[in-house]
Amino acid sequence: MYAHLALILGCWTVVLQGAETDVGERADNRRPIWNLAHMVNAVAQIPDFLDLGANALEADVTFKGSVPTYTYHGTPCDFGRDCIRWEYFNVFLKTLREYTTPGNAKYRDGFILFVLDLKTGSLSNDQVRPAGENVAKELLQNYWNNGNNGGRAYVVLSLPDIGHYEFVRGFKEVLKKEGHEDLLEKVGYDFSGPYLPSLPTLDATHEAYKKAGVDGHIWLSDGLTNFSPLGDMARLKEAIKSRDSANGFINKIYYWSVDKVSTTKAALDVGVDGIMTNYPNVLIGVLKESGYNDKYRLATYDDNPWETFKN
């Protein structure tokens, strides 16, 4: 009898502990943060930046005509970086797939998203849509493996010009025609410019998304090179206010290039969702500090990058 009672009590203990764990996880109201390693264009750099604590990577995609050919930034670039590291785009995507496919020897559970900084400024107007189609084909074949156990990371397509909305329309059309419209659930969008003569207003950016047929999965970036002064973050604060409004169209906002502890804290304090940095370990250190470890945490795969955080 005593043995039976002990067994019952033991089972209840396990159940209660499990319930407490579930409640604890649900009660974690800290803002998830995407730690985006900046300008990762050579495959040898991928594990290096992941080892520094990045849960996301950004690569620059350059075109020959409308064909995405290399991951390459070129000069000038952020201070302290090698501007000319590169890889063939298809090879880079295949390598990303290895790092984000469960069961692969290179798989990293914490690598959850990558941003493709699409250098479409070199394209003529009639090349923009074909370029979007070609990027979709490359991702489908070399990253998603034609829908057969491809990489699981989320993808953000970052375009430097709100006038290039036809890129997105072409991209989406290819996935639909190929029978892989479901993969659009893994894709987000970021219209980041143009920067000259001045950045577009949020209203103009919103209109561009409407023209692209995009309603949701929207990221917005703001910032400058790492050797520029921080400034007053006026546009960033305006974007965050819009994101958090009742009729906001932005889901996530990230700031770049943030390399110092002071600028990292300043960006977190105003409410960003992501930090793009040349030194991912800096953010990791800040997230451990008192005053930050109770408000922010590193995003995981279970965090939806297309969902606006509500606290």
Curated annotation (Swiss-Prot):
Localization in the cell: Secreted
Tissues in which the UniProt entry reports expression: Expressed by the venom gland.
Residues passing through the membrane, by range: none
Enzyme class, broadest EC rank: lyase
Any one GO CC term of the record: extracellular region
Family under the similarity heading: Belongs to the arthropod phospholipase D family. Class I subfamily.
Protein name: Dermonecrotic toxin LlSicTox-alphaIII1i
Organism listed in the record: Loxosceles laeta (South American recluse spider)
